Design a protein with these regions (language model features):
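Extracytoplasmic cysteine-anchoring/structural motifs
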Residues: 18-256
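Sec-dependent bacterial lipoprotein signal peptides
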Residues: 1-18
C-alpha cells in the first residue's frame, strides 16, 4: 500500500514539474534594449522595430529620452528580431528593409539588424547603430568637366531584412555647385559603381569608379563606412581620378 501511495505521489510530482515548466515557457521574457552606444550627437531619433516568431510586433520612434539609455519591454519567448534605423524617415524603412527609389540617392542611414533566441526570463540586446552609407564628394578640376552632366549608377538599391546590401538598380544624377557635387551611396556588395559622363540625353563616357574606389584601399565591409572624396580632372583627351592618395589617369582618342 505504501509503495502504491509513493508511486501516485511521484506521478503527481512529475506532472506538477511539467506543468511548472510549461508555465514558465508561457511567461514573457523581459527584453532590455541597451541603447548606451548610440551616438546621440549624430543620431537624434531611431525608428525601432521588434518582432517575435510568435507574432508580437513593436514599433517606436525613440528620441533623446531613450537613446543613450535602456528601453525595457516584455515579449513572448521565442526568436526575436530587432531593427533600428536612424536618418531614413523619408524612405519608411521597416522589418522588410530599406528600398531606395530609383533616381534618388541613399539616405544618411545608421542601422542595427539582429536576431536571437529569447528563451530565458531576461534578454539584453545591445543596439549598435552602424553608419551604413558613404558620402561621395566629387571635386571638378577642369573647365571641360562643367560642360557635361554626370550620373552615378550601381547594383545596390538599399538593404534587405537582414541588413545586407540589396541587389537592384541605382541611379543618381549629380548636381554641382562651385565645382563640387555629392551623392550618398549605400554599402556596396561589389565594385560595379559607374560614373556616366552625359551629353544631353546621350552617355558620352562611362568610368568604373567602383573599381577605382576599391583600388584606392577603400573597404566596403567596415562596420562604419568612411566617406569618399574624389577629384575629377576631365579634359578633351584624358581624365584623371584622385581618390584620397590614390590616382589614375586615362587617355583616349578624339573622334571628329
Amino acid at each position: 500500500m505504501k509503495m502504491k501511495l509513493w508511486g501516485i505521489a511521484a506521478g503527481l510530482l512529475c506532472m506538477a514539474a511539467c506543468s511548472v515548466k510549461e508555465d514558465r515557457m508561457e511567461c514573457p521574457c523581459r527584453l532590455v534594449l541597451d541603447l548606451h552606444d548610440v551616438d546621440t550627437s549624430v543620431i537624434k531619433e531611431a525608428d525601432v522595430y521588434v518582432e517575435v516568431s510568435r507574432g508580437f510586433v513593436f514599433n517606436e520612434v525613440m528620441d533623446s529620452c531613450y537613446l543613450g539609455n535602456e528601453y525595457v519591454m516584455s515579449v513572448p519567448k521565442g526568436r526575436v528580431y530587432v531593427w533600428a534605423y536612424g536618418g531614413a524617415d523619408e524612405y519608411s524603412p521597416g522589418p522588410e528593409g530599406l528600398k531606395i527609389p530609383y533616381g534618388e540617392d541613399c539616405p544618411e542611414v545608421y542601422m542595427h539588424c539582429s536576431s536571437f533566441d529569447a528563451l530565458q526570463e531576461k534578454a539584453v540586446e545591445k543596439i549598435s547603430m552602424l553608419k551604413n552609407h558613404a558620402v561621395l564628394t566629387v571635386h571638378l578640376q577642369s573647365e571641360y568637366t562643367s560642360a557635361y552632366e554626370m550620373a552615378i549608377t550601381g547594383n545596390v538599391d538599399g538593404y534587405d531584412a537582414e541588413g545586407r546590401s540589396r541587389e537592384g538598380g541605382f541611379r543618381y544624377e549629380m548636381s554641382f555647385e562651385d565645382g563640387v557635387g555629392k551623392v550618398v551611396l549605400p554599402r556596396q556588395a561589389d565594385a560595379s559603381l559607374k560614373l556616366e559622363i552625359l551629353d544631353g540625353n546621350d552617355t558620352f563616357r562611362v568610368f568604373s569608379i567602383g573599381e577605382y574606389i576599391v583600388s584606392s584601399g577603400y573597404d566596403w565591409t567596415r562596420d562604419n563606412l568612411d566617406d569618399i572624396t574624389m577629384t575629377l580632372d576631365y579634359a578633351l583627351s584624358s581624365v584623371g581620378f584622385r581618390i584620397n592618395d590614390w590616382e589614375k589617369e586615362y587617355h583616349f582618342d578624339i573622334v571628329i
